[in-house]
């Protein structure tokens, strides 16, 4: 005991003490050994991150800025602006200026809120921020140019930033969220209240999904639900592009369901949409087990969420989904432990302060690569802080 007391526990050991893996006691010949072994390996390799100074995400900033270590020249920036790959912003003497054009004004407003929150601590700089759904800088593009986008795949060099949706700007879901999901700090409180009303033991053990057909990758789950409704309750809802029942796989569109009502279910599915799905972070706060389909599209906080530690990874074609659902139903304690870790990560590391902190760190580091002094464009206007938004 004396020797043990003097040993330094590695982070993964501490994690196992906090969240013991019940499955470790199962027979090695268990039907579910493959999945249990994956969980054990994931926990052994997992390094919990600090809550200080949003340090969880420093690696993301470093990786995204690596292509620009040779410097960002005035000529390079002029080319980005000329191509109109996003909205051009300038920060000069702690004031924010912008060109008049913005494709989605509410999205720009959501971005501007966070920049204005930290602008007193930022040096002069300029940047192009893309508020479209899709990234703009494929890796084959030469030269690599700096464009900020909220989401990307490994095939892009875009610099990720926390999406406008943490404050405002959609996506609109009629009639539940006509102006978007609203402020993240307020919505998370609603979700946590709902989670408290639906503890694990009271949740429905049918897997659940409601969403529009923004990607055909969602089809197999809808079809499985029609075949086995006790296993999965999944239906398509309408979106702005809906024209006929063909857009909901031959069935009438289901009604939209408020995200707080998702908390009634143990197992919740997340799919990509056009890009990364905005629902992902919300699902964890239900205290439910998140099934994350595919790993291609990411936002800035995704890399620190680990498969088998915080969520159940599902193949893009959903070929493994039935077996995974059978596994979690047969190993309820394991499922609950993963759900707890996922929920705690979002609670601890994706607070509004973390979003603001990320913006500050990102822009501060980015500014170091500008190889010239920024000159204000005369036709740009100053963005003034607006009155605090509190509506959902």
Swiss-Prot record:
Motif (Prevents secretion from ER): 389-392
Disulfide bonds: 49-56, 54-357, 102-108, 263-286
Catalytic center residues: 133
Region of interest (Interaction with the consensus sequence C-X-S-X-[PA]-C in peptide substrates), residue spans: 103-107, 172-178
Catalytic activity: L-seryl-[EGF-like domain protein] + UDP-alpha-D-xylose = 3-O-(beta-D-xylosyl)-L-seryl-[EGF-like domain protein] + UDP + H(+); L-seryl-[EGF-like domain protein] + UDP-alpha-D-glucose = 3-O-(beta-D-glucosyl)-L-seryl-[EGF-like domain protein] + UDP + H(+)
Superkingdom classification of source: Eukaryota
Location in the cell: Endoplasmic reticulum lumen
A Pfam family per the record: Glyco_transf_90
Pathway: Protein modification; protein glycosylation
General function of this protein: Dual specificity glycosyltransferase that catalyzes the transfer of glucose and xylose from UDP-glucose and UDP-xylose, respectively, to a serine residue found in the consensus sequence of C-X-S-X-P-C. Specifically targets extracellular EGF repeats of protein such as CRB2, F7, F9 and NOTCH2. Acts as a positive regulator of Notch signaling by mediating O-glucosylation of Notch, leading to regulate muscle development. Notch glucosylation does not affect Notch ligand binding.
Family of this protein: Belongs to the glycosyltransferase 90 family.
Protein name: Protein O-glucosyltransferase 1
Organism (species): Rattus norvegicus (Rat)
Gene this chain is encoded by: Poglut1
